[in-house]
Amino acid sequence: MIFVGYFFNRLVLPMAFLVFLSVSSHAMDVGEARHLLQRVAFGASPAEVAALVELTREEAVDHFLDSLDHPEFPEPPPFVSRPRPDYWASGWESRDMILQHVAERDQMQAVWISHMIATPTPFAERLALFWHGHFVSRFDPGRVSAPLFDQIALFRREGGGNFRVLLRDVLRDPMMLTSLDNVWNTSSHPNENLARELMELFTLGIGHYDQRDVREVSRVLAGHGVDFEGGWRYRFAVDQADTGEKIVLGQPIAAGSQDQIDRLTDILLAQPQTAEFIAGKFYAAFVSIRPNPEATNRLAGVLRDHDYELRPFLRALLLSPEFWSPANRGDLVKSPIDLVVGFCRSFGLTPPDAMVLVTYLDKLGQTPFMAPSVAGWREGTSWLNMKTLVLRRLVVSRLWDALRVADRTPKPGDLAVRFSSEFIMVPTVFTVRVNGAEVATVRQTIGLDLQKQRSQGDNGGLKPMWETAIIPAKNLPAEIRNVEITHVSNDPDSRLFVNWVEVAGRRYPPQLSRWSPSDAPCAGAPRGMFYCNVGLEFDIAPFDTQQATIDDLRADHNSHIEYTTARLQREEVQDAQPPLEQAFDMMMARVGEGSVSRENLAGQWLLGRPVLSARAEKPALVPSVAQPVAQPIAMTMQPAGNTGTAERGAALIDLLRSMTTDPQYNLK
């Protein structure tokens, strides 16, 4: 038996590993590139796939690991850079203060979702989201805002570094100390919340500690809090600390040390269960929801052998046979953020208003900073049931609507009106007047047909998607002093929602407007929401954009209009993705035209399988849920030579759109 074990370990395992290496040393195909991108990024654009198919697995993985050295950070909302208030000062539970901090949360959500869509370093963002779901801090109930933005920056900066360093920093992070009540933990009045979650959710897992350990860890953490009046920064209060000796998991922490967190961290990471727990969470998030103790133990060994350096661990994870096993492809369910952000990145959609995406995410069950509990979001098949599958299809339909009008970008000197609409039978129409003279009549393109949507299972839960009307500069006066939007539909079921008017690169949201006439039947509605034929007037004057976003924090709240986030303008992405058909053809050229049909390439790209293969090739993750809403994939495209360019492009869009209604699109 000893000889057999020796033979297996010394000869068979190395040979198997060499076989794996020889296979993975070849350039990846589209399916492999898509698989890697779906796991380490969000979605997979044709350009990203085309760039990876020339690389081996090792080269591609190293590319993503190298990107962790220089993650891109989003421009913070202006309020984040201002002096931090005492969030719990007198009056903090007043309606005005609650709404202001909710508006701050909204701005942070809009910025982060926009950054996920646009970032050139998506792996860093993927890891930041992973750690956000591991070291959970929540906006509610304390309604502390700016420190949440700082915490995500910490995850972005250190999420691919060393877990020991990350854990130490998290235990001194103002948002973590606030969210888990350690700001109230003192030697005389212990609070055990952070101590318990540190062991149960962050390191050891359930069953590997006892209540005595919880008490001792809470003693270590006593005095670690924030300076409420000093910018809500981390503070270690010596007079509130317990500097006596502690025994944690049988290991001593010497008395007298002012700060014992580092020693506590070393004790926790010395336990084999910690490496196994962390490896297991990564395996479930990046490889498969089906536990694999053998693979997890092997990866845990990599963590321990490298003193919890995450880079070699991530490399071992992403190059493991389990990661690339065909059995584990399409084995993970896309979270709502995966679905929405992944669609936007895959198809090159960068909407100027991100809060509508956040509202879709809320309906689907996942918005940043709003995890249901300190345990984070339930993953895997918990995302899918009959209701959420219908909602997901409706959300994807809204995103296709946005993509349909995504090329409407104002040029310098143009006037832009950002609006959405609802109607029954008769499309919404409005006029635009500048300085009293009519310059345009606008008819909605992607408005929401309420009757049609109700028949598809949407009972008003999802807002219509924004679109942009553009009046070219040649139709405008040299100086714009006043803009008036007037709803002119004679249909009482027609509704218009105006999010902003843009003049000279500045956005004017409805809170800066007034109804005209002021006594119109629907003038009591929030400004920007047209329920009758009425005008909305904007006076156009210069303003400071940074200050405006601060002022907007005190704007009214509304379920449709993005009052508090409309003026969060980010830099336009230069050298953005080419039009979808062009990007797809570039991917096809890289793969090799003639080697695969457009239909099969599209299937590999979006669904991870050729569309002509049997639908039952891989069993659905939740067949009883997914199969009833399956839609047939259109495969009626004609050869390129038999159709015109426009028809060929339309056929491609129809094909891709049909694929995104397939239940398989919810898997990655």
Located regions from the model:
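N-terminal accessory alpha/beta regions
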Residues: 46-158
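Flexible, low-complexity segments enriched for small/polar residues
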Residues: 28-46, 271, 275-306, 314-410, ...
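Activation corresponds to long, low-complexity, non-globular regions
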Residues: 410-413, 425-426, 431, 440-441, ...
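Extracellular carbohydrate recognition and processing domains
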Residues: 440-476, 517-525
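Active-site substrate-binding loop specific to GH73 endo-beta-N-acetylglucosaminidase modules
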Residues: 92, 105-112, 144-349, 355-359, ...
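Short beta-strand-plus-loop segments that form exposed binding edges in beta-rich domains
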Residues: 485-492
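Bacterial N-terminal signal peptides
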Residues: 10-22
